[in-house]
Amino acid sequence: MRARVLTVVLLLLLAGCAFDGGRDDGPVTLRFQSLAWQEESVTANKELVAQWNATHADVKVEYVQGSWDSVHDQLLTSFEGGEAPDVIHDASDDLADFAYGGYLADLTDLLPARLKSDIPSRSWQTTTFGDGVYGVPFLQEPRVLVANASWLKRSGVRIPTPEHPWTWPEFRRITRRLSGDGKYGVAWPLKEPVSATLNLSLSAGGQLFHQDADGRVTVRFEDGDAVVPRTVHDQVGVDRSASPTTLGSGGSDTLPGFFGGRYAMVPLGFSYRQQIVQQAPKGFDWQVLPAPAGADGTAQGVSPQTLSVAQDSRHQKEAAAFIDFLLRPKNMVRLALGDWMLPTGAQALADPALHTSKDDWATGAALAAHLRPAPAQFVRGYPEWKDKVATPAFQEYYSGAIGLGELRERLENDGNLVLARYQR
């Protein structure tokens, strides 16, 4: 009987150690869930984890591979089940519900002054909810125009630069000029139309989500919000300068037509350059151009990639120390190069490797100062609003099935009904 009791006690002690992520007198084990997916990025993350483990005997990190495709639901399930990783890789526009729901630790007093001062305040705004900071924004990318350089040179159009971009009306005129004979000036890959539309609309003064003094958010589709949607709609349905078949496509789906000379330009995230370098036919001449500018210049919204700490983690200080290690300037540069994105940190962004003309890194770096928090950044209920209201409404508008008035009505009326449930 005594042996049986002793066995039960030992099992309970072992279970306690496993739950604790390490014994009091042994090494702590942190679980780091990474969403890196490109080979270079996965390699960089795993090498940094190995470097940490080689130099920290008391705190070991276990690399866990996650997926962007299912991260929100996967994290929600793990939070509710008490099985969340200690260090969480995500994007800032996915954090609001988790932060307000109490699933993420407030990092305000956990992060070192070095890291806080290195990342600009506009980036910290993307992970600040209420009085707390619930993630460290570390990688971001502008949306750019990837262009067939030879085609543009032959046409004689003005080539835009970050200092002198095209305006939205100029962009529309140029895509008309580049079109004809079954070819299009632009191919918009808008399988996921909401974030692209809202983020680019900042250049025209669009905001869409408006917060009152009490923190209540409502949707108002105003003149600035209409500039980008109307441009896309008219390029497709009026000018015939944008391919209608790519509206339901992802960015990668447009590349064969781009390489084949069917589209002069494709609006894509800056990181798509990696696929272009890998897949472009030999001798294909391409270049990166800034997105068009509006009343607010080349401003555009971004939702940076983030690193957070689970509220239920028993080792929050150690997790924050690991994040600080990952985001030292040289390490942040490695992560940025691996993901073909821009670092948020000022020291990392100044690295010469990110200002070279090769693969147009310099063009992207020149746009970094104009990146702002995405309009949907602080909106509770945004995932449901996006999936149930905004995505079908924008898709139908871009295809010509509905007009601008109905788009406005659905975004505002149906959208505010959804958001109201999250603000009771």
Predicted features along the sequence, with ranges:
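Short, solvent-exposed loop/beta-turn-alpha elements that line the ligand-binding surface or hinge
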Residues: 105-119, 161-164, 186, 206-228, ...
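A structural signal for short loop-to-beta-strand junctions that line the ligand-binding cleft
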Residues: 85-86, 115-151, 174-176, 185, ...
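Hinge/lid segment of periplasmic solute-binding proteins
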Residues: 92-144, 200, 285-289, 356-358
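Glycine-centered hinge/linker elements that transmit conformational signals in sensory
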Residues: 175-177, 214-247
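Extracytoplasmic/periplasmic substrate-recognition and gating elements
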Residues: 50, 54, 155, 234, ...
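Conserved N-terminal structural module of periplasmic/extracytoplasmic solute-binding proteins
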Residues: 2-97, 270, 295-296, 317-318, ...
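Long, aromatic- and glycine/proline-rich binding clefts that accommodate carbohydrate-like moieties
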Residues: 286, 337-388, 396, 420-424
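Extracytoplasmic/periplasmic solute-binding protein
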Residues: 134-138, 143, 169-218, 263
